[in-house]
Structures are given as C-alpha cells and as structure tokens.
Curated annotation (Swiss-Prot):
UniProt organism field: Mus musculus (Mouse)
Bias kind Low complexity: ranges: 76-89
Keyword terms, alphabetized: Apoptosis
Protein name, entry field: Bcl-2/adenovirus E1B 19 kDa-interacting protein 2-like protein
Start and end residues of each CRAL-TRIO domain: 162-323
Oligomeric form and interacting partners: Homodimer. Interacts with BCL2, ARHGAP1, MIF and GFER.
Function of the protein: May be a bridge molecule between BCL2 and ARHGAP1/CDC42 in promoting cell death.
Lineage top rank: taxon: Eukaryota
Pfam families: BNIP2, CRAL_TRIO_2
Bias type Basic and acidic residues, positions: 1-22, 107-116
Gene Ontology BP annotations: apoptotic process
Disordered: annotated segments: 1-116
C-alpha cells in the first residue's frame, strides 16, 4: 500500500507539471503507466531528473536573458547550466561592485600626490608659491576698470581680490619655508606692512587684503603650520581694528584654525599685548594656548631656521637696538 501511494504521488507529479508545457501536450495520455509502476523508487527518481526541462519555465533562466548577455542565447538550456550561469553572473556582479570602489580609492589617492611636492618648493614668495602650488586654483584676470584681479578657488568657494589696490601691502604675508619633518609650513605676518587707518578706502583695502591672506594661506598650508607675527616697527595707526580681527577669526576656515600649531609673536609691544587681551574673549581657549611671545630674533632662530625667512629691515633694526648684535 505504501509503495502504491508513492507510485500514485509520482504519477501525479509526472502528470501534473508536463501539462503546463505546450511542447509536450500528449505525455499524459501515453499508456505506459504499468511500466512506470513496475519500476522501483530509483527509476522514479531518475525520471524526475529526466524531466528537468520542465524547470526551464521558471523565471530564473528568463531573468538571466534580460540581466546578462551570455546566458540567454539558448532558451532550452537545462537547469544545471542555468544555475551555473546564474551563479557565474552573480560572481560577475560582485566583481563589478568591487571594481568601482577600487578605482575610487586609486582616484582619491592621486588627488593628494601634488602635496608631496610641497616641501620641495622652498624659498618662494607668497604669490609665487600660490601660483606654483595652486595647480589651477589661482588665476589673474584684468578688470574693466583697469585693475588686476586675482581669483582664488578653494573647493566650491571663490574669492576675488583686487590686487591693484593691495599691491603696496602684499608683503604683509610671506612664506618662510618648512619647519621640522613633513609639511609644517612657516608663514610670516609682518604687521609693519599693514596700511594706516588714515588712508582713503581703508575698509576696502583691509577687506581685500584679508581675502588675499586667506586665499594664500589655503594654498600654502597643506598640513600643520606655524604662524610668526613680526610686530616690531608697527605703529598704532597700523594696528587693525578689533572688528577686523574678529571677522578674520570667524571667516577663517576651520582647517586653518585647527592645523595652526603655534602663533609666535616677536617684539610684542604693550598695545599689541593689550590688543590680544581684548581679542581673547572672541577666540577659543585652545587657540589662546597656542600663542607664544618672543623678545628677539635670536629666540626665533632657536625655534625655526631663518634662512628662508624674509625679515623686514625695520624689524632687524629694532632687534639690534634692543639686543645688539647678539639679538640676531
């Protein structure tokens, strides 16, 4: 009885599914049931394996026709070939997913190769280094008013600087080489080159001078940097207003504020120290701890090399007056 039930179930399976196939409409009417009943479980399993073309009507082979190019040329392929082709297509899809990520890593690595050349660019001025290191981030254009304009492009930002109006004050910022290992740039800020507050268009000049300094800093600074403020020879009329300093600090990019290792102030006068005390509430405590005061150029020479540092003559003269020949 059990064998008969098994045979009936096998006959039901053999009779039911082939009816769905249009190419085998006469299979249920064949008078070969006694022969099938005489076969044991092994022939029935073989018969089921032999009827594998009925699975070709499943959606898997047809999907492979639309998703891949190489699996749908023969629509009557057996399920083993369909399953192997689908597995192969899955392997190919995984490779395709990994390939873009590998290429993106290679592309992202090439974006920073130019920074490896920064330490070799020694002895450059601020504007020359910006043009040489910017790699297309800086361009000079002539305006309709006859002024020469410099355009700084950093990321998605664009700053236009009136170079004609700030030409006498460009020396306020200069590049002093590199300190230690790596890309630790030395940036000099000589306040003796700042304009006096009594000149015409003072606000306009200071605004474009600030744009010039920020644009040059973003091009020169690759990693950490040391900012040296040469405050010697600066009159009170040349000290910028508090609002300008506060605007500079707030507008300064976070990367430049974070990568600043130290702010070294040389020959700080009493009003410069008082000015820094007034600015302290507007700056962070971390930035305040980075400020360091030096009394002479000799102390500065112990901190950094002065071979590539451009020191104004008025600062050198002040240092000689204060400390004699041993100061430098």
């Amino acid at each position: 009885m059990k064998l008969g039930e098994l045979e009936l179930r096998e006959e039901w399976q053999d009779e039911e599914f082939p009816r769905l196939l249009p190419e085998e409409p006469g299979s249920p009417g064949d008078p070969e049931d006694p022969q099938r009943g005489s076969q044991a479980g092994t022939p029935s399993s073989l018969a089921l394996c032999g009827q594998r073309p009925m699975r070709k009507r499943l959606s898997a082979p047809e999907w492979q026709l639309s998703l891949t190019e190489g699996t749908g040329e023969n629509g009557a392929s057996p399920t083993r070939s369909a399953s192997s082709s689908s597995a192969g297509s899955l392997d190919l899809e995984v490779d395709e997913l990994e390939t873009p990520s590998d290429s993106e890593q290679l592309d992202s690595g090439h974006e920073f190769e130019w920074e490896d050349d920064l330490p070799r660019a020694e002895g450059l001025g601020a504007s020359e280094a910006a043009e040489r290191l910017g790699r297309g981030c800086v361009c000079d254009v002539a305006g309709e008013d006859g002024h020469r304009w410099r355009v700084f492009r950093t990321g998605q930002r664009e700053q236009r600087v009136d170079m004609t109006i700030i030409e006498p004050y460009k020396k306020v910022l200069s590049h002093g080489g590199y300190h230690g290992d790596g890309l630790n740039a030395v940036i000099l800020f000589a306040s003796c080159y700042l304009p006096r507050s009594s000149i015409p268009n003072y606000t306009y000049i200071m605004e474009h001078l600030f744009r010039y300094m920020v644009g040059t800093l973003e091009l020169l600074v690759a990693e950490n940097y040391l900012l040296v403020h040469l405050s010697g020879g600066t009159s009170r009329a040349q000290v910028p207003p508090l609002s300008w300093i506060r605007q500079c600090y707030r507008t300064l990019d976070r990367r430049l504020r974070k990568n600043l290792r130290a702010l070294v102030v040389v020959h700080a006068t009493w009003y410069v120290k008082a000015f820094l005390a007034l600015v302290r509430p507007f700056i962070s405590s971390k930035f305040t701890r980075k400020i360091r005061f030096l009394d002479s150029l000799g102390e500065l020479a112990q901190l950094i090399s002065l071979e590539q540092v451009h020191i104004p003559e008025v600062v050198r003269q002040l240092d000689r007056d204060l400390h004699g020949s041993k100061g430098t």
